[in-house]
């Protein structure tokens, strides 16, 4: 059974305890599952508890996708001076919008002012200067900084005391398990009792519960596996509405995750290219397997193609490798090559003949 666990691709939601870093949790999950392909989504500070989504296997390639989703927290902040409930609600209303944030000194990113959106900010309970609150915010929002800013704007001063993450996108607190639970479930699975483990292991499609979905025709699957984008002729059906620029999920007719990418048209008006993939997960029948599209790698450096054209014209298309066809066709005279080089500014490498 342990061999099957090591081949699984999906997510496990860990209820991170107070104390260890997120990277320490990564290490422990690797040790428990016996696999190296493990990564967390959304780093939590050592003193913060709650939802830490662990991506397993191929799902590590979806970390950047899930990380885009909003996060929810329940926290405790302390005001430095007496403040009424109405004053708390009023200052919370002021922050339920787009705000400017400067990351703290101890952060994993550069200290540049950023714009983040606070979708919800509510007071749950108040006792004296202590306020229990709930916040739903854009990914990358620093709650400790938010509490400090709230205290400053209120004129009372304030700081965060405690914090717990309760959701990352579709991954909620109620499906989280402790590291001890995970170890126990894996031990049971080794004995052939894998029901508990499988009930808490989430398929990769779980990350796209709230995304619009496109089902591709069987005839399009092999093309997608070889890196092709999805065109209108390969669309079988659409579940949900989307607009150009939205992220969409592409499934097979058997509900297998083929890939995800950016829509190039509206769902109400499909035209030519429908999805521009940035992640492809389906394996080709006769290929190298999974494909992760990186558009930047397809961009050529200035002069790169010009250099190739001159080289091919002078020495034949296979001159760089010395392999291939013996007959290269008509060649340009050396003086013509020099003129082309002077005109374009592209010259042969030293030592070339």
Curated annotation (Swiss-Prot):
EC main group: isomerase
Catalytic-site annotation from UniProt: 45 (nucleophile)
Gene Ontology biological process: box H/ACA sno(s)RNA 3'-end processing; mRNA pseudouridine synthesis; rRNA pseudouridine synthesis; snRNA pseudouridine synthesis; tRNA pseudouridine synthesis
Reactions it catalyzes: uridine(55) in tRNA = pseudouridine(55) in tRNA
Biased composition (Basic and acidic residues): 309-328
InterPro entries noted in UniProt: Dyskerin-like, PsdUridine_synth_cat_dom_sf, PsdUridine_synth_N, PUA, PUA-like_sf, PUA_sf, tRNA_PsdUridine_synth_B_fam, TruB_arch
CDD domains found in the cross-reference section: PUA
Disulfide bonds: none
EC number, as in UniProt: 5.4.99.25
Name listed for the protein in its UniProt record: Probable tRNA pseudouridine synthase B
Name of encoding gene: truB
């Amino acid at each position: 059974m342990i061999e099957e666990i090591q081949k699984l691709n999906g997510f496990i939601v860990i209820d991170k305890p107070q104390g260890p870093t997120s990277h320490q949790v990564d290490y422990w999950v690797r040790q428990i599952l016996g696999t190296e392909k493990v990564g967390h989504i959304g780093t939590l500070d050592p003193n913060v508890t709650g939802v830490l989504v662990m991506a397993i296997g191929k799902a590590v390639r979806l970390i950047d996708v899930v990380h885009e989703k909003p996060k929810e927290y329940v926290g405790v902040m302390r005001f430095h001076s007496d403040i009424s409930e109405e004053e708390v609600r009023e200052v919370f209303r002021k922050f339920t919008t787009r705000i400017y944030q400067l990351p703290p000194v101890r952060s994993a990113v550069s200290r540049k002012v950023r714009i983040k959106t606070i979708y919800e900010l509510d007071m749950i309970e108040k006792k004296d200067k202590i306020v229990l609150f709930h916040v739903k915010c854009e990914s990358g929002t620093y709650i400790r900084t938010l509490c400090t800013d709230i205290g400053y704007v209120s004129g009372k001063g304030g700081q965060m005391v405690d914090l717990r993450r309760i959701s990352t996108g579709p991954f909620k607190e109620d499906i989280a398990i402790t590291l001890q639970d995970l170890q126990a479930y894996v031990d049971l699975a080794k004995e052939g009792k894998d029901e508990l483990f499988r009930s808490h292991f989430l398929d990769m499609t779980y990350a796209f519960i709230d995304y619009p979905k496109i089902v591709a025709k069987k005839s399009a699957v092999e093309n997608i596996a070889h890196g092709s984008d999805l065109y209108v002729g390969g669309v079988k059906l659409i579940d949900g509405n989307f607009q150009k620029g939205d992220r969409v999920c592409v499934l097979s007719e058997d509900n297998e995750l083929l890939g995800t990418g950016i829509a190039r048209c509206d769902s109400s008006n499909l035209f030519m290219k429908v999805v521009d993939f940035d992640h492809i997960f389906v394996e080709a029948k006769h290929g190298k397997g999974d494909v992760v599209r990186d558009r930047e790698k397809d961009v050529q450096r200035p002069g790169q193609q010009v250099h190739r054209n001159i080289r091919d014209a002078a020495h034949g298309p296979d001159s760089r490798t010395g392999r291939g066809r013996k007959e290269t066709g008509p060649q340009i005279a050396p003086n013509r090559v020099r003129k082309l080089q002077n005109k374009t500014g592209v010259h042969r490498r030293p030592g070339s003949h």
